[in-house]
Design a protein with these regions (language model features):
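Short secondary-structure junctions
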Residues: 27-34
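Acidic active-site catalytic centers that drive phospho-/nucleotidyl reactions
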Residues: 19, 67, 82
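Nuclease catalytic cores
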Residues: 1-23, 27
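Short, flexible/disordered intra-domain loops and linkers
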Residues: 4-11, 52-55, 91
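Active-site metal-binding core of divalent-cation-utilizing nuclease and nuclease-like domains
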Residues: 37-75
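Catalytic cores of nucleic-acid endonucleases
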Residues: 75-136
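Charged phosphate-binding loop/patch that engages nucleotide di/tri-phosphates or the phosphate backbone
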Residues: 142-160
Length: 160
């Protein structure tokens, strides 16, 4: 069944809200820099270029790019993170999303926003464990701050 434009737009809005909440939560965390990294920033330009097979393969890799790069300012480690909104989290769907990301970005992680909370895992681990994702835990992002951001999610995204 083809998704209507309204349904597609609705899902796009939910995804953007999830990205904004994630970005703000990390931005507020001392010791980390968050950078927009997703394909939305460059694919439109690339799509206008002449397309060879190599170019198409490259565009596909860029299309799968995670949404953010997070830099730990102390260790200089970089974590690539794809953010998804899921009303209902199922291991089968999480694994499918992780597999798609892993095709081009093996070291990326997945952050899921849902009405019940936030979830996080490395895509390679999610593929290996059948898509079972754990609740998000970060030593520098207290539970009360997560609850505040979750309340925003639930304010703007009504239950389906």
């Amino acid at each position: 069944m083809i998704q209507s434009n309204i349904d597609f737009t609705n899902q796009l809005i939910k995804g953007k809200i999830a990205e904004i909440v994630f970005e703000q939560m990390i931005h507020q965390t001392k010791g980390y820099t968050i950078l927009e990294f997703g394909y939305e920033k460059v694919v439109r330009q690339l799509a206008n270029e002449r397309k060879s097979n190599v170019a198409n393969e490259t565009i596909e890799i860029v299309r799968r790019a995670p949404d953010f790069a997070i830099v730990n300012e102390k260790t200089h480690d970089i974590t690539l993170v794809e953010v998804k909104y899921m009303h209902q989290i199922t291991p089968k769907y999480v694994k499918q999303v992780a597999q798609n990301i892993k095709k081009s970005w093996k070291q990326a992680s997945l952050f899921i926003v849902s009405p019940e909370g936030f979830f996080f895992g490395a895509v390679s681990e999610l593929v290996d464990n059948g898509g079972h994702i754990k609740p998000f835990h970060h030593n520098h992002i207290p539970k009360n701050r997560q609850r505040e951001y979750l309340a925003l999610i639930n304010k703007y995204i009504k239950s389906e």
